[in-house]
């Protein structure tokens, strides 16, 4: 069996890069999918001119820094450069809106999944398609821009997501995994292509409004996992590794979204399996072939191979918790006892298990941004208590952990109680579950099933 150093030297290591909401992660694995090196970059979205966004400069600087840190990890562990790879793949925050003209120029700043500015469009398309179109989906962003009469829309030549953008720039290919594509526009049942009837309806709406493009012309081509999706071009290699060490010609997998990577990481891609991801946002996904009524709280996406998935997605999970932990961190520094963030999170999460089952009468509303599941267009985080509430650290933390999953529970209850989707176990991942046993227990209480 080859050592990790030999795998890297022989160009057989595989690199995956994921763009999360707060961290860009680059992980190198060997032939048995064992991590052998990693690098990361911290970043954060900004609210600019009414939209949550990351700039192109943020994207490229973050990608290059995460990759640079990976290279340094490889050199430190294995005393050799990283020049060749066996394969490469991207994943990222799904949905959102990155619109480009025929010259490849970004027409408006990137509008992320977090924006809740597309309510009118989402409602209209849901009615027209008889299929739930959430506010964060790319097609809702596009139609809202059309309804707003935004002048850039007529110039659109390509519309994609963050992962789709990165894949395009590094390969020249306008293709993406079907799971990622299912968060842009509905996928036809039993196919790995956009739903033809819905495409026709949307193209008719666009034509009536005077637009000359069609969805087939501007959307990426969906492909299932395992389909060749291009190779790293010399220009792409220079974008990823400006030092010039990385050689082009590396095959790329179809880019996927964070939903698809979550399903794969938890091995929840077969019918009847389910997983939950909880971090900046949280979402639960159940692989099911059931025909369901239209619910605004339930999204229908697909696995990376195109199997239908019922998803409950909530914009808000840990952002409010993160803000409070930062406050405690600042206090610790002020009294001369600074704490590492990781240790502080562990301490505070464990305190939650000491709290009363009802949080001592405390109430937290964790809406850092809008929450479409509850019909909220803007976020206003709140911490509320009555004079006779029991305010202590255990109750405080327990309340915030329970609040982080409250909106998710509403959607899960619709799936299990109204739609009778069988849920027997959930596989969990994400920052909410880093402290052993804490987030897992809170999630099990919310979903009323075992969580592992």
Predicted regions span which residues?
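Active-site core segments that coordinate phosphate-bearing ligands/cofactors
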Residues: 2-11, 15-16, 120-176, 185-202, ...
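Generic structural signal for well-ordered secondary structure
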Residues: 52, 56, 60-63, 90, ...
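Short beta-strand-loop/turn "lid" adjacent to the catalytic site in phosphate-handling enzymes
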Residues: 75-112, 132-134, 167-188, 219-232
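Core alpha/beta catalytic barrel or barrel-like domain that forms the active/cofactor pocket
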Residues: 36-37, 210-226
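Carbohydrate-associated surface elements
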Residues: 115
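N-terminal glycine/serine-rich phosphate-binding loop of ATP-dependent small-molecule kinases
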Residues: 1-108, 123-124, 155, 216, ...
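Anionic group-transfer/hydrolysis microenvironments
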Residues: 20, 27, 103, 222, ...
């Amino acid at each position: 069996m080859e050592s990790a150093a030999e795998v890297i030297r022989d160009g057989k290591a595989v690199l995956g890069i994921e763009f999360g909401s707060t961290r860009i992660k680059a992980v190198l694995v060997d032939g048995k999918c064992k991590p052998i090196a990693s690098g990361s970059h911290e970043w954060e979205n900004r609210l600019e001119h009414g939209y949550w966004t990351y700039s192109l400069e943020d994207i490229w600087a973050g990608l290059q820094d995460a990759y640079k840190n990976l290279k340094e990890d490889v050199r430190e562990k294995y005393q050799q450069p990283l020049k060749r790879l066996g394969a490469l793949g991207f994943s990222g925050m799904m949905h959102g809106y990155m619109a480009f003209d025929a010259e490849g120029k970004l027409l408006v700043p990137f509008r992320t999944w977090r924006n809740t500015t597309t309510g009118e469009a989402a409602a209209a398309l849901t009615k027209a398609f008889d299929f739930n179109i959430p506010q964060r989906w790319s097609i809702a962003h596009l139609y809202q821009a059309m309804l707003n009469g935004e002048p850039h829309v007529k110039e659109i030549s390509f519309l994609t997501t963050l992962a789709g953008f990165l894949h395009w720039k590094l390969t020249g290919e306008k293709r993406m995994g079907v799971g990622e594509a299912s968060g842009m526009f509905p996928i036809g049942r039993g196919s790995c292509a956009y739903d033809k009837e819905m495409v026709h309806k949307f193209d008719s709406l666009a034509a009536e409004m005077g637009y000359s493009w069609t969805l087939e012309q501007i959307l990426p081509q969906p492909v299932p996992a395992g389909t060749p999706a291009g190779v790293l071009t010399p220009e792409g290699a220079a974008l990823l590794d400006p030092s010039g060490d990385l050689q082009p010609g590396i095959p790329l997998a179809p880019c996927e979204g964070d939903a698809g990577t979550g399903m794969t990481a938890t091995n929840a891609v077969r019918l009847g399996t389910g997983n939950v991801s909880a971090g900046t946002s949280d979402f639960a996904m159940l692989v099911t072939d059931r025909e369901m009524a239209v619910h605004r709280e339930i999204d229908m996406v697909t696995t990376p191979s195109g199997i239908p998935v019922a998803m409950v997605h909530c914009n808000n999970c840990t952002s409010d918790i993160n803000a409070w932990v930062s406050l405690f961190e600042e206090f610790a520094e002020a009294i001369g006892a600074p704490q590492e963030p990781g240790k502080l999170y562990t301490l505070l999460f464990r305190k939650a298990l000491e709290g009363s089952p009802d949080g001592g009468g405390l109430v937290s509303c964790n809406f850092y941004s809008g929450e479409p599941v509850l019909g909220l267009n803007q976020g206003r985080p709140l911490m509320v208590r009555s004079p006779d509430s029991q305010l202590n650290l255990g109750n405080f933390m327990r309340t915030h952990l329970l609040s982080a999953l409250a909106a998710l529970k509403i959607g899960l209850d619709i799936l299990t109680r109204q739609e009778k989707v069988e849920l027997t176990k959930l596989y969990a991942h994400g920052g909410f579950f880093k402290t052993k046993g804490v987030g897992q227990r809170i999630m099990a209480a919310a979903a009323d099933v075992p969580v592992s």
